[in-house]
């Protein structure tokens, strides 16, 4: 587990006005932290900045002891479940779950072992050969969650994980 620290974080798309201003938060290892607010207030943008998918235009983001503002997403050692699930339609459930492991060059045996474990945990064992279009919304959501869990990252960001 790693500490996540947002120090005076701001976000501007036009360099004139901030859509997120001066956020200061420390999330300790093992802590369960929830962002709550009305639609359009910047919750998803904040998660995307932590993940490295959106530029931080002000302040400092630390993961562990390391400042990560300019670190690419692949180097941040975290996983993310997206609001829209972000599944690859041409891949099977099994391939979607394993995608990040394949990119990280995890052995086939280890990928398969982790996939079986997480599929059992989330009730997806019977769906591993199906494509996302063959699944209900709740099943797709569980595939996205499985893909995040299977990576065993110390930090997991979830954008509206219970929306379905």
PLM region descriptions:
Residues 1-164:
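ABC family nucleotide-binding domain
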């Amino acid at each position: 587990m790693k500490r996540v620290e947002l120090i005076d974080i701001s976000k501007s798309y036009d360099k004139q006005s901030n859509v997120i201003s001066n956020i200061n938060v420390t999330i300790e290892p093992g802590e369960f932290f929830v962002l709550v607010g009305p639609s359009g207030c910047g919750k998803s943008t904040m998660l995307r900045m932590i993940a490295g998918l959106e530029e931080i235009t002000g302040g400092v983001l630390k993961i562990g002891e390391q400042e990560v503002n300019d670190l690419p997403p692949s180097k941040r050692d975290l996983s993310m479940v997206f609001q829209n699930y972000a599944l690859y339609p041409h891949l099977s459930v099994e391939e979607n779950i394993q995608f990040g492991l394949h990119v990280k060059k995890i052995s086939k045996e280890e990928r398969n072992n982790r996939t079986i474990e997480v599929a059992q945990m989330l009730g997806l064992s019977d769906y591993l050969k199906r494509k996302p279009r063959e699944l209900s919304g709740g099943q797709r959501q569980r595939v996205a969650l499985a893909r995040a869990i299977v990576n065993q990252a110390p930090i997991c960001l979830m954008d509206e994980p219970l929306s379905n």
